[in-house]
UniProtKB/Swiss-Prot annotation:
Keywords: Amino-acid biosynthesis, Cytoplasm, Histidine biosynthesis, Lyase. Its main location: cytoplasm. It catalyses: D-erythro-1-(imidazol-4-yl)glycerol 3-phosphate = 3-(imidazol-4-yl)-2-oxopropyl phosphate + H2O. This is Imidazoleglycerol-phosphate dehydratase. Belongs to the imidazoleglycerol-phosphate dehydratase family. It comes from Halobacterium salinarum (strain ATCC 700922 / JCM 11081 / NRC-1). It is found in: Cytoplasm. SUPFAM superfamilies: Ribosomal protein S5 domain 2-like.
Length: 196
């Protein structure tokens, strides 16, 4: 099987980001964005998706969390797009419902080459740790755009920590399922068009 890894860097006046991704990893992760709860969520994504991930971001957190979260989403999405490559043999579609106590996240993904993001729901508290709750949805919108995937997400619950964590775990599981190699496809692109 082809090596499905990528390394992406992004440097702007607002952030300096470095990301590595291995789609066929073991869930190993090293994450340092300066936002503890966001680090925890990226670790949950890696662990539950069985992706080996490193993320380092030095951002302008003295302004707010927006640039850091968005630019990590850009870099991780770009790394995903590079790592998945021509998408030969992948499952392509997947869906997961993941609970965390009272909260439930629903995730549907199509590794389609088309960037679409829909989010249904909201977060019960405006912040969790140093993360503005709505930035969790914005992160996945940014990821979907730069990964060129269709991603439909929803959350329901009473505790924003649980809602966001269920969302990150759910995306990890769904993306892992969608990128798994199906031996029956024998390296073919999963599309009637022959290309994604």
């Amino acid at each position: 099987m082809t090596d499905r890894t990528a390394a992406v860097t992004r440097e702007t006046a607002e952030t300096d980001v470095a990301v590595t991704l291995d789609l066929d990893g073991d869930g190993e992760h090293t994450v340092d964005t300066g936002i503890g709860f966001f680090d925890h969520m990226l670790a949950a994504f890696a662990k539950h998706g069985l992706f080996d991930v490193t993320v380092r971001c030095d951002g302008d957190l003295d302004v707010d969390d927006h640039h850091t979260v968005e630019d990590v989403g850009i870099a991780l999405g770009a790394a995903f797009s590079e790592a998945v490559g021509e998408k030969r043999g992948i499952q392509r579609f997947a869906d997961r419902r993941v609970p965390l106590d009272e909260a439930v996240a629903s995730v549907v993904v199509d590794v389609s080459g088309r960037a679409v993001y829909e989010f249904d729901g909201g977060f019960s508290q405006p912040t969790v740790g140093g993360l503005t709750s709505r930035m969790a949805a914005h992160f996945w919108r940014t990821f979907a755009t730069h990964a060129a995937v269709t991603l439909h997400c929803g959350v329901d619950g009473e505790n924003a920590h649980h809602e966001i964590e269920a969302l990150f775990k759910g995306v990890g599981r769904a993306v892992d399922d969608a990128t798994r190699i199906d031996q029956r496809r024998a390296g073919e692109t999963p599309s009637t068009k022959g290309d994604l």
